[in-house]
Regions:
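Bacterial N-terminal signal peptides that target proteins for export
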Residues: 2-11
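Bacterial N-terminal signal peptides
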Residues: 12-22
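Sec-dependent signal peptide cleavage junction
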Residues: 21-37
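Active-site-adjacent structural elements in enzyme catalytic domains
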Residues: 41, 45-235, 239, 245-247, ...
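Glycine-rich, aromatic-bearing surface loops/beta-hairpins
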Residues: 98, 105, 112, 132, ...
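Solvent-exposed loop/turn segments at secondary-structure junctions
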Residues: 210-211, 234, 238, 317-325, ...
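Extended boundary segments
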Residues: 215-217, 226-280
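...with weaker cross-activation on analogous glycine-rich loops/strands in unrelated enzymes
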Residues: 254-341
Length: 369
């Protein structure tokens, strides 16, 4: 029988190898101004992101591998964020915009892409309603309030946000794989099956424009991730058992649970709280990704061709702007040999994927089937 010390050494080695192989990002080692966010240190942000998957963190602590994992994540963060900041700087220069410009200068830029970027930034910083782990959006109450911000500062914020939202959940997947290869069991984890592709697509097609009455439709905000979660549930992804089912309706901020329970005794307070007990992982773009990414293979890219090569009907695709968070979830579908997407808000059924590529600048695919 192998000793615990040998097991711990093997876990550390596997984690290191998997993380290094998984996260090499090309790019020059150029640092954007003020890479850290104004509210928390980078270390605190990473800790917060990891806390979203407490069972994995607890397992690493039990095996005395958590510090090694944190060190690897921190090292990867420096490389990844700087490379991403360099890429974003090149994107801006391709629009004829200097990174030293302010947000307000984008409004009158000659390139339409730069003017679109202005609108995207406003949506990110002013219209964003979800909690953020990087920025306190409440300080930005109008477009005018952000027009004096340096683009170089936003580049750093956006790169760090992407690392927290996208890369950290992916790193946790490799940590889980390493722990499981060494026989560590997670008795409270749900089963993570390969989902039923046909069931996902059939559900998406059936309710793309005719909403399922079993689920409440929000009167404000987006229904896109709520719709995707419904399709995944139809495809065989089990809801996490919750103690609040039927007794304490409301929206629970969590990425360790995934559920939507009707609860007739609810009092209307927000669109998602009325007659519903729901997790944010069911209804928020970022939280759904954080919930799924440690357990399913993912692809992240800004290259349309790379995205196309990784599409499959039934997969989840998420899109976002050049600067800012991912903001839309859809189900990949196919029609007449062309890749399409089916979604809510706006309601689309088998809309050509080229429109998705035109609307967004970066993409994530979750391979659930």
């Amino acid at each position: 029988m192998r000793s615990r010390s040998i097991c711990r050494a093997m876990i550390c080695l596997l984690l290191t190898l998997m993380l290094v192989c998984a996260c090499v990002v090309p790019g020059l080692a150029v640092t954007a101004d003020r890479l850290t966010a104004p509210e928390k240190t980078t270390e605190q942000l990473i800790e917060d992101a990891l806390a979203m998957n407490r069972s994995t963190v607890d397992a690493m602590k039990k095996e005395h591998t958590y510090k090694a994992f944190l060190d690897t994540v921190a090292a990867r963060q420096q490389t990844w964020v700087r490379a991403e900041a360099t890429r974003l700087t090149k994107v801006l220069r391709g629009m004829g915009v200097s990174p030293k410009s302010t947000v307000g200068e984008l409004k009158t830029a000659q390139d339409p892409a730069a003017r679109k970027l202005y609108r995207d930034i406003c949506r990110w910083l002013v219209d964003e309603t979800e909690d953020s782990s990087v920025l306190a959006y409440s300080q930005f109450t109008s477009a005018k309030a952000i027009e004096g911000l340096d683009l170089s500062q936003l580049i750093g914020w956006s790169a760090l946000q992407d690392f927290v939202d996208t890369i950290v959940p992916e790193l946790l997947r490799y940590a889980l794989e390493a722990l499981r290869q060494l026989g560590f069991e997670f008795p409270n984890d749900p089963l993570w099956p390969t989902l039923d592709q046909k069931a996902i697509v059939d559900y998406a097609h059936k309710y793309a424009k005719k909403y399922n009455p079993a689920y409440r439709v929000p009167t404000s905000g987006s229904d896109c991730t709520n719709f995707v979660s419904q399709a995944l549930y139809a495809g065989g992804l089990s809801m996490t058992p919750s103690s609040i089912r039927g007794t304490n309706p409301g929206t629970k901020t969590t990425t360790e649970e995934w559920y939507y329970y009707n609860s007739p005794s609810a009092t209307a307070r927000t669109p998602y709280e009325y007659a519903v007990a729901v997790s944010t992982s069911w209804v928020r773009v970022e939280d759904l990704y954080t919930y799924l990414a440690p357990h399913y293979n993912t692809v992240t890219s800004t290259n349309d061709d790379v995205v196309r090569r990784n599409l499959k009907s039934g997969y989840v695709i998420q899109g976002g702007p050049t600067l800012g968070r991912y903001e839309h979830s859809s189900i990949v579908t196919e029609k007449n040999g062309k890749w399409c997407y089916t979604a809510h808000t706006n309601d689309r059924k088998d809309r050509d994927m080229k429109h998705y590529f035109n609307a967004y600048d970066k993409f994530r695919i979750i391979k659930v089937c």
